[in-house]
Amino acid sequence: MARDDVIEVDGKVIEALPNATFKVELDNKHVVLCRISGKMRMHYIRIALGDRVKLELTPYSLDKGRITFRYK
């Protein structure tokens, strides 16, 4: 269940970093550092370079986020 105060945006994975962390370029060309959500980790959903993903950003820190969905 999503929280009420998060900002959901779409982006494209441009770099894979250690510990399930990724650099994602948003549709407005900003680059955000993102981690995988717990449900995606639990269900072994893999993310590769170039994948389109949905992110959740908090209003407090717009340069870090959480990947919640990978588009097919």
Curated annotation (Swiss-Prot):
Presence of keyword Protein biosynthesis: yes
Any Pfam family: eIF-1a
Alphabetical list of SUPFAM superfamilies matching this protein: Nucleic acid-binding proteins
PROSITE patterns linked: S1_IF1_TYPE (PS50832)
One Gene Ontology cellular component: cytosol
Cellular localisation: Cytoplasm
Main location: cytoplasm
GO molecular function terms noted in the UniProt entry: ribosome binding; rRNA binding; translation initiation factor activity
Cysteines paired by S-S bonds: none
Keywords annotated in UniProt: Cytoplasm, Initiation factor, Protein biosynthesis, RNA-binding, rRNA-binding
Signal peptide residues on this chain, from the entry's feature table: none
Domain S1-like: 2-72
UniProt family annotation: Belongs to the IF-1 family.
Record's subunit section: Component of the 30S ribosomal translation pre-initiation complex which assembles on the 30S ribosome in the order IF-2 and IF-3, IF-1 and N-formylmethionyl-tRNA(fMet); mRNA recruitment can occur at any time during PIC assembly.
Protein's job: One of the essential components for the initiation of protein synthesis. Stabilizes the binding of IF-2 and IF-3 on the 30S subunit to which N-formylmethionyl-tRNA(fMet) subsequently binds. Helps modulate mRNA selection, yielding the 30S pre-initiation complex (PIC). Upon addition of the 50S ribosomal subunit IF-1, IF-2 and IF-3 are released leaving the mature 70S translation initiation complex.
Annotated PANTHER family: TRANSLATION INITIATION FACTOR IF-1, CHLOROPLASTIC (PTHR33370:SF1)
Entry protein name: Translation initiation factor IF-1
Organism: Helicobacter pylori (strain ATCC 700392 / 26695) (Campylobacter pylori)
